[in-house]
Regions:
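Short amphipathic alpha-helical interaction segments
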Residues: 185-200
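An alpha-helix initiation/capping motif
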Residues: 82, 189, 215-218
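Short, amphipathic alpha-helical interaction segments positioned at domain boundaries
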Residues: 216-229
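Minor-groove-contacting beta-hairpin "wing" of winged helix-turn-helix DNA-binding domains
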Residues: 210-214
Length: 229
């Protein structure tokens, strides 16, 4: 509750000085997190007229201070995490937030244009040290060293042929709109065959030549996507 109160103050302050498009992150799979607590968080933030939510499942990485037996053992199991995710997706939909990607929900017209460029394999330009760009059909990387950046125009070509079919499939299946199998004519029959198997388990929806993951499918997206690339 203290965190919610702090977040509310920050959001109200941002709105008071003119910020109208605000995104909030939600963590799922926290120690002691119940559906009731998650519902409270979602509704409290929604009451603040937030336009965009990003929701992430907690993952404890190796070699971090959080990777201890006490913390690991306090976390919910996979079944409870699945219940939390599916509840969140349904609850946000009821509140008018459309899920457009595995971890992202928004009011109509407030989808992240920045991230959609990556997921749809569209071109973008990055500026400054460590920046990456996808421009004129090629990907570029600017070195991270500030002095080299200031004293040189050097860029490093990282990929001369980006936007492969596998990349489009991998990224496209992260989106709720999915992929159009007509865009992959040589794999169309195979895709339909695989999709029908997943459809039986309510993991994939097949509609108008599009294959798209369901909320349940998003929970095992890596395994499903690997079957298509």
């Amino acid at each position: 509750r203290r965190v919610l109160f702090r977040s509310e103050k920050i959001i109200n302050s941002a709105q008071s000085i003119g910020f109208k498009n605000i995104s909030c992150d939600i963590m799922i799979g926290l120690s002691g997190q119940s559906i009731e607590k998650l519902k409270l968080t979602i509704h409290k933030i929604a009451e603040l007229s937030i336009q965009h939510f990003s929701a992430y499942i907690l993952k404890i990485e190796e070699n971090t201070p959080f990777n201890t037996p006490d913390i690991i053992n306090s976390l919910p199991d996979d079944d409870h995490i699945s219940d939390l995710y599916l509840f969140m997706a349904e609850e946000l939909q009821k509140l008018g937030y459309n899920q457009y990607e595995i971890s992202n929900f928004s009011k109509m017209g407030f989808e992240s244009k920045h991230n959609l460029k990556y997921w749809k394999c569209q071109e973008y330009i990055g500026l400054g040290p460590s920046a990456h760009s996808y421009f004129n059909g090629k990907r570029y990387f600017i070195p991270s060293d500030l002095n080299k950046y200031l004293n040189s125009t050097e860029t490093i070509l990282t990929d001369e042929n980006p936007g492969s079919d596998d990349e489009k499939i991998m990224l496209g299946l992260r989106l709720t709109e999915g992929i159009n199998i007509n865009d992959f004519p040589s794999r169309k029959a195979l895709f339909l065959e695989k999709a029908k198997v997943f459809n039986k388990f309510n993991l994939i929806e097949i509609k108008n030549n599009f294959i798209k993951l369901t909320p349940k499918g998003f929970l095992v997206s890596n395994s499903i996507i690997n079957e298509f690339i």
